[in-house]
Amino acid sequence: MQPIQIAIVALVVAIIIAIVVWSIVIIEYRKILRQRKIDRLIDRLIERAEDSGNESEGEISALVEMGVEMGHHAPWDVDDL
């Protein structure tokens, strides 16, 4: 192979690696943003429960829509056996 062909192949490989790495970064960033949104909703829910004595149905339904279940956060810490 001539040097120009080696350079072109190296450039293509570098571009493919960059695309894969940035795809992984974007996926992880979206996960972090989703987790922050869930954490904010849970914090608001806890704050409202402390203030009013009951939980807000709107925020619980928003968490359920996102796939977050409320309940025991640590399944190994259950005292109702």
Curated annotation (Swiss-Prot):
Membrane topology classification: Single-pass type I membrane protein
Protein name, per record: Protein Vpu
Stored Gene3D superfamilies: HIV-1 VPU cytoplasmic domain
Predominant location: host cell
Subunit structure: Homopentamer. Interacts with host CD4 and BRTC; these interactions induce proteasomal degradation of CD4. Interacts with host BST2; this interaction leads to the degradation of host BST2. Interacts with host FBXW11. Interacts with host AP1M1; this interaction plays a role in the mistrafficking and subsequent degradation of host BST2. Interacts with host RANBP2; this interaction allows Vpu to down-regulate host BLM sumoylation.
Phenotype for residue 18 to H: Renders Vpu susceptible to rimantadine binding and inhibition
Regulation of this protein's activity per its record: Ion channel activity is inhibited by hexamethylene amiloride in vitro.
GO cellular component, one term: membrane
GO process terms (BP): receptor catabolic process; symbiont-mediated suppression of host innate immune response; symbiont-mediated suppression of host type I interferon-mediated signaling pathway; symbiont-mediated-mediated suppression of host tetherin activity; viral release from host cell
Organism of derivation: Human immunodeficiency virus type 1 group M subtype B (isolate BH10)
Family, as annotated: Belongs to the HIV-1 VPU protein family.
Gene: vpu
Domain of life from the UniProt record: Viruses
Domain notes for this protein: The N-terminus and transmembrane domains are required for self-oligomerization and proper virion budding, whereas the cytoplasmic domain is required for CD4 degradation. The cytoplasmic domain is composed of 2 amphipathic alpha helix that form a U-shape.
Transmembrane segments: 7-27
Positions bearing Phosphoserine: 52, 56
The keyword Glycosyltransferase appears for this protein: no
Ranges in the topological domain labelled Extracellular: 1-6
Alphabetized UniProt keyword annotations: AIDS, Apoptosis, Host membrane, Host-virus interaction, Inhibition of host innate immune response by virus, Inhibition of host tetherin by virus, Ion channel, Ion transport, Membrane, Phosphoprotein, Transmembrane, Transmembrane helix, Transport, Viral immunoevasion
Lineage: Viruses, Riboviria, Pararnavirae, Artverviricota, Revtraviricetes
Membrane topology (Cytoplasmic): 28-81
Record-linked InterPro entries: Vpu, Vpu_cyt_dom_sf
Protein modification: Phosphorylated by host CK2. This phosphorylation is necessary for interaction with human BTRC and degradation of CD4.
GO MF annotation terms: CD4 receptor binding; monoatomic cation channel activity
Subcellular location: Host membrane
Additional notes on this entry: HIV-1 lineages are divided in three main groups, M (for Major), O (for Outlier), and N (for New, or Non-M, Non-O). The vast majority of strains found worldwide belong to the group M. Group O seems to be endemic to and largely confined to Cameroon and neighboring countries in West Central Africa, where these viruses represent a small minority of HIV-1 strains. The group N is represented by a limited number of isolates from Cameroonian persons. The group M is further subdivided in 9 clades or subtypes (A to D, F to H, J and K).
Purpose of the protein: Enhances virion budding by targeting host CD4 and Tetherin/BST2 to proteasome degradation. Degradation of CD4 prevents any unwanted premature interactions between viral Env and its host receptor CD4 in the endoplasmic reticulum. Degradation of antiretroviral protein Tetherin/BST2 is important for virion budding, as BST2 tethers new viral particles to the host cell membrane. Mechanistically, Vpu bridges either CD4 or BST2 to BTRC, a substrate recognition subunit of the Skp1/Cullin/F-box protein E3 ubiquitin ligase, induces their ubiquitination and subsequent proteasomal degradation.
